[in-house]
Amino acid sequence: NVIANCGLVASPNDIVKKTSKELGLKQKGIETSGKELAKKLKGKTPIIYSSQKLLCLSEKWKTDINENAKTHAFYNMFSEFNHNEICSYENPVGNFHVVILNDADDHIRVKKRIDIFKKLLGEYNTPVQEIAIKGDNYLTRLFTTVWMGLYVAYNLALEYNIDPTPVKIIESLKKDLK
């Protein structure tokens, strides 16, 4: 009701129903895209970038890949990494694959940075996959992106022949901390 009282939506129930319906229609495409991206990420370290507005989604993708595929992944945001981290592409120590989460509502300056950054990555032969976040409303775009990230992490685990469910190292850490 807070969302409705603020005038952001007519009714929270309506937006949830609309989001649920749209996600149902997108399910197959999300699954397929997740599998395809997982194949591209196999053997590489994913670095996920987004605008500050979507930073929580970048972090979610990173933690899902860490936990489910049992491999490193990192994240950062436009424009912060443009001040220093971008220099690391001149001398990359590792096999990286950049994933950019891109929302149509991102600020025009962020969009410009993304375009320039993709061009620079091409000059340094760093693979990049841009994920255009789509949906009729912010909630749909949010859930679509979370869902796709989960499919990427799950399928990346399968690519590595790893069971994504156990978290043995976390359990060991917790046990030793007692």
Question: What would you call each of these model-derived segments?
Answer:
Residues 1-178:
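A SIS-like phosphosugar-recognition module
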